[in-house]
Amino acid sequence: IESANEFYPFTAKQLPTTENCHVLDLGCGTGLELQEYYLLNPSAMVTGIDLSQGMLAELKRKFANKDITLMLGSYFDVPFGEEVFDAAVSVESLHHFTKGEKIKLYSKLHKALKDKGYFILTDYFSLSDDEEQVHRRNLLALKAEQGITDDEFYHYDIPLTVKHESEALVEAGFSSVVVLNNWGATYTIKAVK
């Protein structure tokens, strides 16, 4: 991914460095952002959620000596709890979902964060409303062509614009949403509870 060598370290630097803080990683994969983060905060307690057993196994192998809890499943389905996490992070994972789906997820995430907790989102976004609509139309056409129902998850990119992503976060209850940086179409957004 273009600029990954820049945005993974940048994202990690946005996470809390307080001792024994608890961080939720949505779509953690093999933990690319955690490589950088554990250098900054070796005592962090991380809960990672991912759909891939193989990626979780690799992450566990890489960080066998860290305080990490891994959950196999969809972050839409796995319970997060309430006021559990100091921060949450997601890198290049949430561009597969509609604004409505994200509002539901972000509402659940908002409840899971402690007071003054925050969410760091690094992902790629559509650069215009037209581009966002093209992605959405292409997905709908593909689903119709292949008989995929709305109940089924289909791994297809439908990135929102930064404006629409920010609106989803605000609608979910976040009080402050700011863009921290960008690399072309990839942005880092911070949303504070």
Name each model feature, range by range.
Residues 122-172, 178:
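C-terminal alpha-helical "lid/dimerization" subdomain adjacent to the S-adenosyl-L-methionine
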Residues 103-115:
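A short glycine-rich, Lys/Arg-flanked "PGG" loop and its adjoining helix->strand segment in the class I
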Residues 92-93:
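Short catalytic micro-motifs in class I SAM-dependent methyltransferases
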Residues 172-193:
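Core SAM-dependent methyltransferase catalytic element
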Residues 88-89:
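Hydrophobic beta-strand segment of the Class I
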Residues 2-19, 36:
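Conserved alpha-helix/loop element of class I SAM-dependent methyltransferases that forms part
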Residues 24, 30-77:
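Class I SAM-dependent methyltransferase SAM/SAH-binding core
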